[in-house]
Amino acid sequence: EHYFKVEEADRQVLGDPAGEIISRGGEVLFAVSRGREQVIGTCALIRLENETAELAKMAVSEEAKGKQVGLLLGESVIELARARGFRTLVLESNRKLTPAISLYKKLGFIEKPIPHPSEYSRVNIYMELSL
């Protein structure tokens, strides 16, 4: 809730990741700090269609920001999407998340017109990566 209010779609996915992500062919990734065994970042790969997946729910703890954790998670989810045979990886975000948008561009995502109304009121940017 630091940047946006938690919406019903957030509650649904975060409240049942096994049912909403994993059972549908997706996966949740975690970054764990060395030594402390503490989760410092996470993101999800959500299967949308046979050849399309979404990078979603990326978050990095305050103490881990600026330490390339987001980059490592992004690279890992891209590698996983390729290994699973997806041809396109998409994401929805908000332009005020400037560091995140810069990261997505660094990972190769390209801004595209928003193709359909989002489940989230905060979405004002849509990006795609051809795998």
Go through the PLM ranges and name each one:
Residues 72-89, 103:
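Conserved acyl-CoA
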Residues 1-56, 61-63, 74-76, 80, ...:
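Acetyl-CoA-dependent GNAT
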Residues 40-43, 69, 92:
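Short glycine-rich loop/turn motifs that provide flexible caps or phosphate-binding loops at active sites
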Residues 61-63, 67, 95:
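Active-site acidic-Proline motif in GNAT/NAT acetyltransferases
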Residues 87-131:
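C-terminal "cap" of GNAT-fold acetyltransferases
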